[in-house]
Amino acid sequence: MVTNKKEDEALSTTSAVTGLPQKRFYRQRAHSNPIADHSFDYPARPEDVDWRSLYPSINDEQQVEFADIGCGYGGFLVTLGEMYPKKLSIGMEIRVKVSDYVVDRIAALRLKNSETAAYQNIACIRTNAMKYLPNYFRKSQLEKMFFLYPDPHFKRAKHKWRIINQALLSEYAYVLRTGGLVYTMTDVEDLHKWIVSHMTQHPLYERLSDEATKADPITPKLYQSSEEGAKVVRNKGDHFLAIFRRI
């Protein structure tokens, strides 16, 4: 089998035991300022996105339907790929080294599973979802969006930086199809209350009932699949979950 350049680069930082990249080569601050003028390459419109470079096995009828916003080190993204092998999932991460880690992690997983074509349905891009989401997705394209353990921006002056706010909720509604779901999880109760307040006040969302939330097959995976979620479990912290439907 011929490996591509990204797979070859990933091998230089991988563990000899697991065959996966090691986080110690990708350390970075826990959060990044989403308002700062980072340097990003981004498409002018969704039609300009080269999805085939991210999903080598994509066919002409397929499109990305799941988006993990602020995907961190990719633990939950990998879980999505395993749970929904016929769906394309994208992770969007603003931090350079962290997004590099996820890209290398996916390359290593694809290489390890080259005989089964597993993990061909997940990918990660470095971008600022608070600014460029409509550049990547068409109207009503997405079925599910995930906001797991977002930066709480504790200071009141920085609340405007929170990834859930009234203006951005309208953008999310634009790229979400009717009936699509927004999954939110945090270990900060104040942020959870903020999210619930803003989303229930927005006319295009309704919160799922407790019964519907528990019945969703993704719900159990939200607690420990991501690295941040697993850390909260280890520290015996609280999880605050809310799922909303696009109406």
Curated annotation (Swiss-Prot):
InterPro entries: SAM-dependent_MTases_sf, Trm8_euk, tRNA_(Gua-N-7)_MeTrfase_Trmb. HAMAP family: tRNA_methyltr_TrmB_euk. Transmembrane segments: none annotated. This is tRNA (guanine-N(7)-)-methyltransferase. It comes from Drosophila grimshawi (Hawaiian fruit fly). It is found in: Nucleus. Keywords: Methyltransferase, Nucleus, RNA-binding, S-adenosyl-L-methionine, Transferase, tRNA processing, tRNA-binding. One of its GO terms (molecular function) is tRNA binding.
